[in-house]
Amino acid sequence: MTMPNFFIVGAQKAGTTSLYHYLNQHPQVYMSPIKEPFFFDHEMDSKGRVVRREFEGHRQPPRFTNIEEYSTLFEAARGEKAIGEATPLYIYAPGTAERIERYVPGAKSIVLLRNPADRAYSAFLYAVRIGAEPLTDFAQALREEPLRIRNRWHYIFHYRSRGLYYQQLKRYYEVFGRERLGVWLYEDMREDPAGVAQSVFCLLYTSPSPRDS
């Protein structure tokens, strides 16, 4: 059973899609064909089976019901040094870091962070664009966020809360340590995507760029 050895865990609207595509071009990197599997954000039993809960409307419905199904995402890997996936909800969903470490011990995590206000507004515009957000006023959506969270609205509506990076990073540092957790900024990704990608390649123990492999 082939499993990933690294994860792009967030944050949403912070450049994770661009980084996914950059990494996917590297011959020593295999990325899951589904960019966002939404697997480790779900609770699992002792056998790696997703625990379904009817009240969890705030979570993305599971694409895979157990660890064996999830591993099929990586069965086409052919000796690449780095095997990964990118689900930006992972940094925010409670318990995800611990589940990754339990089922994929020693894996590395990559985080992209964006100015929280810019990130929140970008997430709001995205939710409006796809028809998920019923409001058109961002300020009103922020005012209603605490009530939405209490009513277990989907994580996509947690605009302000998903930008509270301290607690999110704290969990990952506690689980992964500094040696297995890399943090970059969205602004750096925009200004120098190749430079950020090269530093990520170094974290993943690959050569700096495709032409060097």
Model features per residue range: what roles?
Residues 126-127, 199-201:
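Short, surface-exposed, charged loop/turn segments at secondary-structure junctions
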Residues 92-95, 121, 194:
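Short N-terminal helix/helix-N-cap motif within the alpha/beta-hydrolase-1
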Residues 205-212:
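Conserved small/polar residues in nucleotide/adenosyl-binding loops
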Residues 100-103, 201:
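Short, surface-exposed basic-aromatic patches at helix termini and helix-loop junctions that form
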